[in-house]
């Protein structure tokens, strides 16, 4: 390990805005399987990590924290939490938040598989998935797969939105398929964010009727793609855009967690950390969201391109 990383890890310990729990703080038991247990911060983020109580917006796989930092500046009436497992990446965002005395930004270093151990039902208003790994060979490792969506809706407020922004056409199409398979409400969907209006829209404004339900606590969404979706760019987005990849964007709602799924939140069985990602509990075992069973096979029959590509050329299904 390089001296630079060691220095960042040491400085991470000094940042009050960065929470770095040890694995045994959220895992109980021995052997191949572990039981997930609640962390003390669960239900207490507003009182323990921020300078004032506000609706909480979560970014999963935040990397260097560019989205969290920029959104926090644009929306001071909301609290933002960036989650990632890489401490060297989190250092940049935590450093910037600390230097600029940003009281509405926090970071959490943990595996996203453990995310429900940190948030109480209704504690999070909105979720962003920005340029996460498409996990071409492991469906259950995709952050927008039914198994992860079941975890999110245990703590996402009623009417809460999930934003997916990615250079991977594969992940975008897969997530669309998940939404359609489960009749999830799609608010915006564009396969080329910087060159087109949202699919099913005119001049960038959605034609879908209806307004936000009263239970929604996130920043107002009036049927248009928010300016920050295009204006805020992560390190990876900038890199992929320069390489010619199209950026896709999808926004959808999750229904509230069913009673049986919520009740299982305190007794979730987690796989051994050394086990393959797709050896996890299957979606039907933890909730009611279904996987688009034939999507992967159909996709690769429809698209020319190597399986190892991070992103794929544009295509029509």
Name each model feature, range by range.
Residues 1-52, 190-266, 272, 278-317:
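SAM/dcSAM-binding transferase cores
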Residues 61-65:
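Class I SAM-dependent methyltransferase "Motif I" SAM/SAH-binding loop
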Residues 94-121:
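S-adenosyl-L-methionine
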Residues 159-166:
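Conserved beta-strand signature within the Rossmann-like core of class I S-adenosyl-L-methionine
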Residues 86:
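Conserved SAM/SAH-binding beta-strand->alpha-helix loop
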Residues 118-126, 131:
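A short acidic, Gly/Pro-enriched loop at the edge of an enzyme's catalytic core
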Residues 144-158:
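A short glycine-rich, Lys/Arg-flanked "PGG" loop and its adjoining helix->strand segment in the class I
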């Amino acid at each position: 390990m390089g001296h630079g990383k060691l220095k960042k890890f040491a400085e991470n310990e000094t940042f009050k805005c960065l929470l770095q729990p040890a694995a045994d703080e959220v895992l109980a038991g021995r052997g191949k399987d572990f039981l997930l247990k609640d962390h003390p911060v669960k239900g207490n983020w507003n009182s323990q990590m921020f300078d004032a109580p506000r609706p909480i917006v979560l970014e999963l796989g935040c990397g260097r924290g560019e989205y969290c930092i920029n959104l926090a500046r644009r929306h001071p009436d909301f609290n933002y939490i960036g989650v990632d497992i890489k401490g060297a990446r989190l250092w940049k965002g935590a450093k910037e938040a600390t230097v600029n005395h940003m009281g509405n930004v926090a970071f959490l270093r943990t595996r996203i598989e453990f995310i429900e151990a940190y948030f109480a039902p209704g504690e999070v208003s909105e979720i962003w998935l920005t340029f996460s790994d498409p996990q071409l060979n492991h469906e259950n490792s995709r952050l927008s797969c039914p198994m992860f969506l079941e975890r999110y809706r245990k703590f996402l407020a009623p009417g809460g939105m999930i934003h997916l922004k990615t250079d991977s056409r594969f992940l975008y199409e897969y997530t669309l398929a998940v939404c359609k398979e489960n009749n999830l409400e799609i608010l915006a969907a564009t396969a080329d964010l910087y060159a087109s209006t949202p699919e099913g829209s005119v001049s960038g404004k959605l034609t879908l009727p209806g307004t936000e339900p009263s239970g929604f606590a996130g920043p107002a969404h009036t049927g248009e793609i928010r300016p920050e979706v295009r204006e805020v760019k992560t390190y990876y987005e900038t890199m992929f855009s320069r390489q010619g990849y199209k950026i896709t964007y999808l926004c959808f709602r999750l229904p509230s967690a069913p009673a049986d799924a919520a009740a299982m939140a305190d007794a979730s069985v987690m796989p051994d950390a050394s086990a393959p990602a797709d050896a996890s509990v299957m979606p039907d075992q933890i909730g009611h969201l279904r996987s688009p069973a034939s999507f992967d096979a159909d996709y690769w029959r429809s698209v020319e391109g190597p399986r190892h590509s991070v992103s794929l050329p544009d295509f029509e299904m």
